[in-house]
Amino acid sequence: KSMALWFALDRWEDMKSHIDGEYDYMIINRYVLSNAVYQSIRDIDLQRPDIIDWVFDLEYGHFCLPRADIYLFYDVAPAQAGENVMKKGFRDYVGGEKKDVYEESCGIQQRARAKYLETAQRRGDVAVIQCMGDEGMRSIEDIGAETMRVLRERNMI
């Protein structure tokens, strides 16, 4: 739980200057759902009860972070995700390495994907965008069109 708290505090620090209603839309990468999923699949916590609901209560209830209207989970096969990471440019938070500690482990990637899909089944605010087709990654245009379709279906745009 301590890792979840650190991520929540970091997010709270970044968001405390946000004024509700200031923008029509806010698109945030790796928000509360990401913290909840990754904390729930850590090796050390696999035998403990799922902490996803605890993380949501911490970030939304205690820190009063703005609630996401929708979470978009872009579903990519872990092997393809690993290939995509290798194409990224320099990222200072990985200290010059190509992958961070979570990206390095195929097991973590597989558990995270499974937990995102499970969570999408349990919660109405998570939409799964399929990024893989029969022949690998779908095109950016196809993925973008599906994203727009999901947002329209949910009256987000």
Regions found by a protein language model. Give the residues of each.
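A glycine- and Lys/Arg-enriched "phosphate-lid" helix/loop adjacent to the NTP-binding pocket
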Residues: 35-114
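Structured loop/turn residues at beta-strand edges in well-structured enzyme cores
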Residues: 21, 66, 124
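Conserved catalytic core of Hanks-type protein kinase domains
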Residues: 9, 30, 74-75, 84, ...
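NTP-dependent small-molecule kinase module
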Residues: 79-157
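Short beta-strand segments at enzyme active-site cores
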Residues: 27-29, 74, 127-130
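ATP-dependent small-molecule kinase phosphotransfer cores
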Residues: 1-63
